[in-house]
Amino acid sequence: VNKKVAGIIHAPVSDVASNYTKLIQSGVPFVCVERNILGSGIDSVEFRDREAIFKGADYLLASGHKNVLFFRESTDSTTRDERTKGFLNALEKYNINTNDANIVDVTLEKGEDDCMLAIQKALRRYRPTAVLAGGNRITLYLMKTLRDMGIDCPGEISVVGFGDESWSELTYPPLTILRRDVKGLSAKAVGMLFEKINTGVAISHDCYADVELVVRKSTKMLDNGPFGDKAAAPDSVGLTKEEETQTKGRTLQGCDLFPLYRNVLGRIA
């Protein structure tokens, strides 16, 4: 490491400390981003990966999907472990046995064709109603696989992707995505690095950047109603002109609402 370098922002490809011995021993201040180096005491700024995947899985499960397939990277890392825990935590919330969790590893190092083949096999084996992707490239390969298989999204399979790629809102349909706050992560990492350069230690304690669930058009709700009726988006439910006339200017009680509910239900079922 060049001693003239004031500081380094480092994105580790591994979380094993022995892979970075020279960097650690150099004395040059550095901060890790996205992944930490285990057992080293090195400062890092990471995304809330467990919380992120929980959000995605929770959204699908709350929409009535019980057969949710989770694709994750096959690498042995804390990031993969945290995302897996988030998925399992969501299943537990809905009283789904985690032993029955549909989790498939995708080995990105094998290349696009092999990854898409693995995804295709998993889709045919598990026949999910919804899929959650655990990484940027997995999301891309998943969408390509669905296209090649002629699977309608979200008609046949709902999809929640992962990442910050601009193409996610340009796909058809626009992709519901777990969007990482990359700018927030970068700002925190730079701030922490300057603290270390100026004082020798990192003063900041907020070492995480958020991940937001951005809901678009690649997911749909399944049957959730009390009578086995289909769930519907609010903007697809409306009263007829006759019903509007009947209810105009009236304070409705429960006995008035129930017939209206059944009428509307019959139109969207």
Role assignments for model-derived ranges:
Residues 54-94, 201, 205-220:
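An alpha-beta-alpha
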Residues 222-247, 254:
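Intrinsically disordered or compositionally simple regulatory linkers and C-terminal tails
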Residues 12, 49, 80, 135-136:
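Helix N-cap/beta->alpha junction signal
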Residues 41-70, 85, 89, 111-120, ...:
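Hydrophobic alpha-helical segments within soluble ligand-binding/sensing domains
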Residues 88-112:
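Short beta-strand elements in bilobed, periplasmic/extracellular small-molecule ligand-binding domains
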Residues 1-58, 62, 120-125, 245-249, ...:
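Alpha-helical recognition/docking segments in bacterial nutrient-uptake
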Residues 116-227:
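Flexible loop/turn connectors
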Residues 66-68, 98-102, 152-159:
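Short acidic capping loops at alpha-helix termini that bridge into adjacent secondary structure
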